């Protein structure tokens, strides 16, 4: 009986390692599209995912939001993800990172109060959020992110959906 229990525990411990993929040092590249509430516009961009360890991922990205009502924006994010596998093909990850955005306004934009106010505003900030990743096939994945960007005068909620490949 004792040997049976030890064998079962050993078998379970060995099979657990198969649930955690070995990603350390791998790089993924993909595209993303989404919506941001403050700019009230759709955006598209690219992202890179670099696994520093099996669970810690560095994710820089660039996104451009199309012009709407005389306003447009582009942004660069440098996020960190802590990937938590929930099944063999699905993972959740909290998001934390830094943000830089460039906001452009036409002269007739509602945000321009007087003629002397600059029409371009640069905003550093912080990102916090949650993401979900689903591995579609070998080296192919889809991801969905919901994050809040803390910016001076322009804080916003942003939803992004992406698609990417691992190398």
List where the protein language model places each region.
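A generic hydrophobic-segment detector
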Residues: 122-167
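A cross-taxa feature marking solvent-exposed loop/turn segments within ectodomains of secreted
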Residues: 22, 39, 87-89, 137, ...
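Sequence/structural signature of outer-membrane beta-barrel proteins
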Residues: 32-38, 63-69, 100-105, 145-153
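Residues that define the transmembrane beta-barrel architecture of outer-membrane proteins
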Residues: 25-27, 40-44, 72-76, 122-126, ...
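Cleavable N-terminal export/targeting peptides
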Residues: 1-24, 167
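Membrane-embedded beta-strand positions of outer-membrane beta-barrel proteins
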Residues: 27-33, 58-62, 78, 94-96, ...
